[in-house]
């Protein structure tokens, strides 16, 4: 009998989770444009100890999830979708290990899948059970806050990333730039709309590829990786000046001025074999400490 009750309880919880996942509550930035990547955040206060906790994200683009500042996303370009598509896709994260018994901060870094306007940016459900067996559930609504992130698409189909904007504080429990945040806008949904679940497919790092050699011509450096791959380059910089602009292929990076910093794409990939890096009049070739190629492939987690 006890085993039967456990099975029934698990089935009910699964059904509840499925119902939660398809109960879409779309939100967006109040001023949607075609190129901006958006930071979303909210906080939830618990008065009980959490036993299990999940976050289901549906989006028409890509979304990286952070819980109490820690990265809960497992893969690159998540949730998985076909390139240049904007239909809703969803994925569910078990965030139990990140949960706290007092305040849980949920933060999402959203990007459109390609430069275009779509008012349905994010739908999120945070749900689970407490140690006493009771359940909780929260959905995305106008209480969520948002602001433009440090990155956006550029006119070359890549990204422009402003390293001067702090990439860590926005997902922390306490933030000091609250004046830059605004309330989200609730968006309507289409009747009988169900997102495609892509939990079984993911973009993952296949390998880290060193360059074979490089050529320097004045302050322009070309790195040759030998065989080509799909992914991006990760560039480590040292001694770059604040506001210095560096062009890494089609990506533009604006330096923070910190002693060491890294520049790499966030929500795009590119074919890489030879990579040319140059910069503005502040840039010097010796600002580059290391260049690595990151190869991205699609895996089926059920195989």
PLM regions with names:
Residues 20-303:
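Extracellular/oxidizing-compartment recognition motifs
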Residues 1-21:
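Bacterial Sec-dependent N-terminal signal peptides
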């Amino acid at each position: 009998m006890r085993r039967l009750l456990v099975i029934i309880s698990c089935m009910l919880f699964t059904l509840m989770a499925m119902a939660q996942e398809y109960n879409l509550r779309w939100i967006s930035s109040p001023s949607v444009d075609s190129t901006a990547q958006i930071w979303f955040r909210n906080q939830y206060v618990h008065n009980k100890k959490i036993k299990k906790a999940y976050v289901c994200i549906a989006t028409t683009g890509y979304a990286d999830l952070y819980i109490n500042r820690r990265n809960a996303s497992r893969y690159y370009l998540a949730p998985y979708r076909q390139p240049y598509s904007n239909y809703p896709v969803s994925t569910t994260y078990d965030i139990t290990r990140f949960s706290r018994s007092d305040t849980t901060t949920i933060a999402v870094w959203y990007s459109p899948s390609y430069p275009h306007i779509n008012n349905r940016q994010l739908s999120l459900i945070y749900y689970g059970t407490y140690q006493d067996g009771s359940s909780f559930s929260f959905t995305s609504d106008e209480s969520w806050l948002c602001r433009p992130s440090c990155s956006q698409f550029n006119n070359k189909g890549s990204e422009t990333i402003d390293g001067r904007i702090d990439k860590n504080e926005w997902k922390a429990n306490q933030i000091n730039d609250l004046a830059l945040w605004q309330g989200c806008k609730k968006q309507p949904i289409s009747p009988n709309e169900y997102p495609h679940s892509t939990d079984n497919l993911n973009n993952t790092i296949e390998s880290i590829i060193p360059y074979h050699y490089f050529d320097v011509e004045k302050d322009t450096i070309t790195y040759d990786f030998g065989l080509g791959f799909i992914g991006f380059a990760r560039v480590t910089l040292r001694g770059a000046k604040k506001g210095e602009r560096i062009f890494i292929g089609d990506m533009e990076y604006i330096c923070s001025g910190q002693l060491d910093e890294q520049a790499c794409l966030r929500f795009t990939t590119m074919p890489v074999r030879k990579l040319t890096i140059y910069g503005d009049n502040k840039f010097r070739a010796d600002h580059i400490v290391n260049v690595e190629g990151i190869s991205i492939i699609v895996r089926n987690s059920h195989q």
